[in-house]
């Protein structure tokens, strides 16, 4: 997705502050048409917008005895994705923005964050607390380690997105900076900071990362992707 398209969409989107409110009181006769309402004349649960709830409280303060408010976001421009559309394993606590592509058999672990415009290939695992920035492109059968950061490039809009090709393994807490391409089958060591392109089938390590060797059979065995973890049945 083009950065300028994302920027224009965010700029023009109606900003939302979604809430869940639990209210009790004499609720008979109150107009809840601005909300999704579940309840009866004494207690109800409301899903809606904060400004609408403020107005409701002001208009019916004599009837509402008590309430508890949960604010999900403030002036949010983009919703979270409907994860039911993905043929992937998505664990509790993952945060995925709308307009993210996730391939079949991918695995998104607890605490992972994936921003708008990102693409996750088939069979790729995004491990716990990894951050995939806006417009990042990750290929098939990759493993992005726990706590890794794949930089996003929505601002500035001219920046080139990160591209991680197929069958790449990125170690825990590694950082891939804007504009970098990591070639097919490469391995990025844990904690590395990658500032320039990584050739295919090489191992890079360090800060800044540099090539330390070519992929060999021992490295392949240590970084092997386990297909059983991608099984959705």
Curated annotation (Swiss-Prot):
A GO molecular-function annotation: tetrahydrodipicolinate N-acetyltransferase activity
Entries under CDD domains matching the protein: LbH_THP_succinylT
Top-rank lineage group of the source organism: Bacteria
EC number: 2.3.1.89
Pathway(s): Amino-acid biosynthesis; L-lysine biosynthesis via DAP pathway; LL-2,6-diaminopimelate from (S)-tetrahydrodipicolinate (acetylase route): step 1/3
Enzyme class, first EC level, given as a word: transferase
Keyword Amino-acid biosynthesis: yes
UniProt keyword Nucleotide-binding present: no
Keywords: Acyltransferase, Amino-acid biosynthesis, Diaminopimelate biosynthesis, Lysine biosynthesis, Repeat, Transferase
Gene Ontology biological process terms, A to Z: diaminopimelate biosynthetic process; lysine biosynthetic process via diaminopimelate
Catalytic reaction annotation: (S)-2,3,4,5-tetrahydrodipicolinate + acetyl-CoA + H2O = L-2-acetamido-6-oxoheptanedioate + CoA
Any single Pfam family the record assigns to this protein: Hexapep
Function: Catalyzes the transfer of an acetyl group from acetyl-CoA to tetrahydrodipicolinate.
Annotated family: Belongs to the transferase hexapeptide repeat family. DapH subfamily.
Protein name: 2,3,4,5-tetrahydropyridine-2,6-dicarboxylate N-acetyltransferase
Species of the source: Thermotoga petrophila (strain ATCC BAA-488 / DSM 13995 / JCM 10881 / RKU-1)
